[in-house]
Amino acid sequence: FYPPFDGIPELKSAGRNFVKAFLDLDVENKHIIPTCGSLQGGYISQALAGNMHKNRKTILYLDPTFPVTRYQAKFLGLKAIGIDLYNYRGNKLIEEIKKHVANGKIGGILWSSPNNPSWSCLNELELKQIAEICDMNDILAIEDLAYIGMDFRKDYSVPFCKPFIPTIGKFGENWITLISASKAFSFPGPRCAISIISPHINEKKYANLKDFCEREQFGHAFSLGGLYVTTSGTSHTAQYALAKM
């Protein structure tokens, strides 16, 4: 029989516990959505970000980023622009983001942290201010925790203990966080990951999403409008394996 579009209960529960243990985020099972790798989670996230509002068809990348994410935007008919993190950090980064957001065309902001391939990491001050920008302008923050916990300047390896891995989820409401099993657990072959959807935006309704994928509520648009029409969910085998990890 087919796996549930939004994931098996075992992985949703294990994912919720993992997120609490290492990111100190409190979410429910319904906010944990297994995908066929983080790339699928990012693909659906970008599709929704570019269609939450009319005329916001641009994704802003904090570069360098995994090149395939830009190819995804092109495939989706979205415009891609970037800010090079080598040149902009701290307040300079925030001011540059604000300049791009001011044109009213940005639907989503996407980054990876630790960054693939530069290994740079956004700090909590930057994350807090990016969250404020996204919440104020109803922009979707797409956070790819690509090499999760692999910033070895701090020890993030002890569950349920500080320090916790920095995440946009501690500061904002309009976010999706992607966690890759390929990198976190050296589990690339079966193509499995989890997307954590902000409890706030999960329930939010967008008339433009209704026009785009027949689902007005954001969470339904992700699982039924995105996962169902692309891969009909993620395989049972991969989900059970990841849940055990």
Description of each model-found segment:
Residues F1-N137, I142, I148-G172:
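Conserved core of the PLP fold type I
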Residues I165-M245:
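Conserved core segment of the aminotransferase class I/II
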